[in-house]
Amino acid sequence: MADESSSPATGDPNSQKPESTTPISIPNPNPNPSLTPPPPQQHSQPPVAPLVPPGPPYAPPAQIPSSLLPTNLPPPPPFRPGMQFTPVANFQNPSSGVPPPGSMPQYQPQPGMRPFQPMANGYPGIHGVAPPGAMPPHGLLRYPSPYPTMVRPGFIMRPPGTIGAVQLAPRPLIPGMPGLRPVMPPMVRPASLPFVTPAEKPQTTIYIGKIATVENDFMMSILEFCGHVKSCLRAEDPTTKKPKGFGFYEFESAEGILRAIRLLTQRTIDGQELLVNVNQATKEYLLKYVEKKIETAKKAKESQGTKENQAEGPESEQDKLESADNETGKDGESKIKENIDIANSAVLTDEEREADREAMEKIETAIEERLKSNPLPPPPPPPADGSGMEFAFKSKDGDSNTDVARSDAAANDVETSGEHNRPDTSSPDWSKRNDRRSRERGEKEQEMDRYEREAERERSRKEREQRRKLEDAERAYQTRLRQWERREREKEKERQYEKEKEKEKERKRKKEIRYEEEEEEDDDDSRRRWHRAALDERRRRQLREKEDDLADRLKEEEEVAEAKRSAEEQNLQQQQLDALRILSGQAAIGSETVQTSPIENDHKATLQTVGESANEHHAADFEENGSGNESMAIDNNSGSEAHAPSKKLGFGLVGSGKRTSVPSVFYEEDEDEARKAKKMKPLVPIDYSTEEQEAVAHGGSGNTPPHLALAAEFAKRISSTNPKEETIETEKQRSRRSHDKASHRDRERERERDRDRDRVRDRGDGHSGPTKDAKESGKAKIIDTKFLDAKQLIDTIPKTKEDLFSYEINWAMYDKHQVHERMRPWISKKIMEFLGEEEATLVDFIVSNTQQHVQASQMLELLQSILDEEAEMFVLKMWRMLIFEIKRVEAGVPVKSKA
């Protein structure tokens, strides 16, 4: 240690550089180079440094001019107290391979003191002040300090080092080298202070498993019976948000862990045996704690045994100590290191045993209350391999064994004493004491055997009880498990039944919706057909009424014209009669009347017949239509009045009969009178026999005047020619009208049949057999097929599924005209509509099947697996299109753009 400053490892690195030839070229950081080392002192004198203020700086030597002094020197170093070290005795300097330089003879440091006094600014100083003309020692530069005098605070020197130790030697001064720093010994920890191991952090965390059904609060309450719990860490399942089946609990002391291991190992909660374990760090901590506790108990018992057994002598104490050491070493330490259950190896006092018993009672009470209040859910099954049972038995075996070992060690510890009081075995009373100790040891062994037998019986009883509880719990669990499985099966069946019911309801609902949609479509179709039929019926009725009105109007006009002609003819006849009366005179009135009565009667009978027939026909039409023209009624009345037949008054006398048909003031007759007049029997003219006419002719032929004969001849000619011609013409007109009316009725009847046939075709009544008129019209249509258009062809195509599937298709015409090429675009378009994308393969498949002349039912079966529910609709539409194309080809109808 004395040569530490001179070693190359601790020396200044500048000491290895070559010597400089120009000492003033490198500025020296030492501002005071004129200091000299202190003179040697005697060892008897105390090392006291005089507190003398520093003197003025030395003047520069004469050989160094002032111009060569440095002008820009660094500022002085700041005030910095130097480090102070205490020398360490017997310090060996590490060998670096370079021997230290020898010490100079002219400088001998005082023993026990440092070579230089530590200064506040870090530079070494000397004791005392050199005189003004003194030369500095070798190795120090001789140049003046550019700084003013520094006032250095004085301080009391340290006491000398340890007596007998090698002191420090200064490094030899080398000329031309800057000054060295003071040699400071290394700072070493005082040897008197003992090494203190840092306090070990207690590892008091315990792992408890198989607590999946146990709440954390209940687990904390159970652990509080063992000791205070500082913290707990129990993870939660992220899906169910329930705590997992294990947890980490940190106790405040190691006693809590030991008690928890003793009381909770293999403890059954909710049908599961708790798994209590510690990690390696906690196990080591517990081992140390148990060893320390055993050691403390041993020392305490040794001290107690020393006080109690001093009267027996040192020999007995030494024997007890040896036996205790041997037995404890065998039964205590070996079992602590070998036994997994560390807690059972701890030395328990009476208070700790009482605390364990109370904690055990509290834990059992809490578990029983939990079983009563919360029997469900059933506990999970125990491990199948039975490792838990074996571990429980092993742990309990360990408990009993360690208890026996502890009792044995405790009994031996009572008799032990200190090692230093062991007596000599040559004492005369040693044999007696040895015999007494053997007897006592035998009694203790017998007591230990008895205790072991009792412990074994107790352990067997506990094992049987535990096994019985486990079997009961297993049976209860199996029973509950079977009940739970039965309930779950029933619930699953109910769920399946509910699902089937829901599916059935859904199927029924879809079927009802589809049926309602079809009903609505059918209702819409029937409503449209009914509406169309009603419109057609109304249109036909209106047309029929218009035609009837037109026919009635024509008939009325004809009747009016006929009545006018009849009136004109009657007026003409009246004029003729008046002329005849004027010509014949009053005397021949009777004879003329007699002669002309047959002719007049014939003529009047004809007119009466025509008028009555006209009036009757008109009245019937009036009643049938329910309406009539007032003016026409007036004309008819006037006509009837004009044509009113004259009543026969006797042979050849005829009355006018106008009184019976006199109109009322308003030219209207009462309904009863009009009905009676219409229902009156028409008058029939009297036919005279030939004998009567000859008698009348012979009676008046002799004295007939010539002018009367001329007038009679004229009237006869008129009556014989006019009525006949008029009658023929009237008959012709009547036959023409009847013919026109019959032809009109035929045309109307034909149109009515056509409309009925169209209505039946619109309704789709294809199953009804065709009537005779339909067959005739069908023949006419077959003849005129080339004049039909696409609309009429579409109307002839069947609409129902049965009719379409039973329709005979002309496949020869299909193959001849290659109808499949015309069908291909339509099929591709419909497939695009049904599937949403083009399927060229499916289109080719359908076209190829139609070329093979498959039936509609076969085509439906082929497409059923591809189009599902839409297959039937597609086949129906395609078959209608196929029939239309074949019919169009047969009829030669060109394709229209809209078709």
Curated annotation (Swiss-Prot):
Biased composition (Polar residues): 1-20, 626-640
Record localization: Nucleus
GO molecular function: RNA binding
Coiled-coil region(s): 434-578
Gene Ontology CC, one term: nucleus
Nuclear localization signal 2, short sequence motif: residues: 735-742
Mod. after translation: Phosphorylated; the phosphorylation level is repressed by abscisic acid (ABA).
InterPro entries: Nucleotide-bd_a/b_plait_sf (IPR012677), PWI_dom (IPR002483), PWI_dom_sf (IPR036483), RBD_domain_sf (IPR035979), RBM25_RRM (IPR034268), RBM_PWI_domain (IPR053294), RRM_dom (IPR000504)
GO annotation, biological process: abscisic acid-activated signaling pathway; mRNA processing; regulation of mRNA splicing, via spliceosome; response to abscisic acid; response to water deprivation; RNA splicing
Keyword Chaperone assigned: no
Sequence motif Nuclear localization signal 1, location on chain: 526-533
Observed effect of gene inactivation: Increased sensitivity to growth inhibition by abscisic acid (ABA). Altered transcript accumulation profiles due to impaired pre-messenger RNA (pre-mRNA) splicing (e.g. HAB1 transcripts alternative splicing). These phenotypes are partially suppressed by an ectopic expression of HAB1.
Keyword field: Abscisic acid signaling pathway, Coiled coil, mRNA processing, mRNA splicing, Nucleus, Phosphoprotein, RNA-binding
Acidic residues bias spans: 515-524
Annotated region (Disordered), positions in chain: 1-112, 298-572, 611-778
Domain PWI stretches: 802-899
Protein name as it appears in the record: RNA-binding motif protein 25
Originating species: Arabidopsis thaliana
Lineage: Eukaryota, Viridiplantae, Streptophyta, Embryophyta, Tracheophyta
Gene name of this polypeptide: RBM25
